[in-house]
Design a protein with these regions (language model features):
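Acidic, Mg2+-coordinating catalytic module of metal-dependent nucleases/exonucleases
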Residues: 104-111, 115-116, 120-121, 154-191
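Conserved non-catalytic scaffold segment of RNase H-like nuclease domains
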Residues: 2-114, 160-162
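Short aromatic/basic micro-patch
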Residues: 134
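Short, well-ordered secondary-structure micro-motifs
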Residues: 30, 117-118, 145
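A short alpha->loop->secondary-structure connector
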Residues: 121-131
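Short, glycine/charged-enriched secondary-structure capping and boundary segments
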Residues: 32-35, 119-123
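Short, motif-level signal for alpha-helix interfacial/capping segments enriched in acidic residues
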Residues: 1-7, 150-155
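Active-site-proximal helix-loop-helix substrate-binding element of RNase H-like nuclease domains
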Residues: 54-69, 73-76, 137-180
Length: 191
């Protein structure tokens, strides 16, 4: 069994938390494309990664999503990286920063971002450097603070309780850094 197919390590195995954010052209990998990916170490957001990708030919382009991320389809088709190249770069960066530690994917509504990253890693490379290790900040907030409903875990609600200096801009690296700051607050602030 190769390292990327192994389950997360046992208790005591070193872990490295990596904040990841994506911008997409649709709601799922089967109906849209991964357009941009930003990542940084939670404990050192200056160690970061960012790539823009070419859309999958024929994949949907949701105008509502485009208004949010403000990426231009024609520019991405011309200047974005081929998905296999971008995912090779991402996996290489994750492998470099994690060393012998288990890489843990951290996101705000991690299931959305993780499904695109996992799909693209498997589809274009045949491996996912995160395995199934993901930490969702919304769920962490809900459990840590005893929040009684998922609806009360939106970015505005969490930011009101745990303000951070970084802004949510819908640029993947900016948002990964904002999530890293929020993760540090959720993990290290006293209760």
């Amino acid at each position: 069994m190769t390292r990327e197919h192994e389950p997360p390590g046992a208790v005591g195995t070193p872990e490295i938390l990596i904040s990841v954010d994506v911008e997409t052209s649709g709601p799922s990998p089967g109906t849209g494309s991964l357009l941009a990916i930003g990542a940084c170490l939670v404990e050192d957001p200056t160690q970061s990664f960012y790539r823009e990708l070419q859309p999958i030919p024929g994949a949907a382009w949701d105008p509502a999503a485009a208004r949010v991320h403000r990426l231009d389809r024609t520019e991405l088709e011309r200047h974005g990286l081929a998905p296999a190249v971008a995912m090779t770069d991402l996996c290489g960066w994750v492998d470099m920063v994690r060393g012998d530690a288990q890489a843990v994917f951290v996101g705000f509504n991690a299931p959305f971002d993780w499904m695109f990253v996992a799909d693209y890693c498997w589809r274009f490379l045949g491996r996912n450097p995160f395995g199934h290790a993901a930490l969702d900040l919304k769920a962490l907030y809900m459990g840590r603070d005893g929040v009684g409903s998922w609806a009360a875990t939106g970015k505005d609600a969490v930011a009101a309780r745990y303000p951070v200096d970084e802004a949510h801009t819908h640029q993947a690296l900016d948002d990964a850094r904002m999530q890293a700051a929020l993760a540090r607050r959720l993990l290290h602030d006293p209760r």
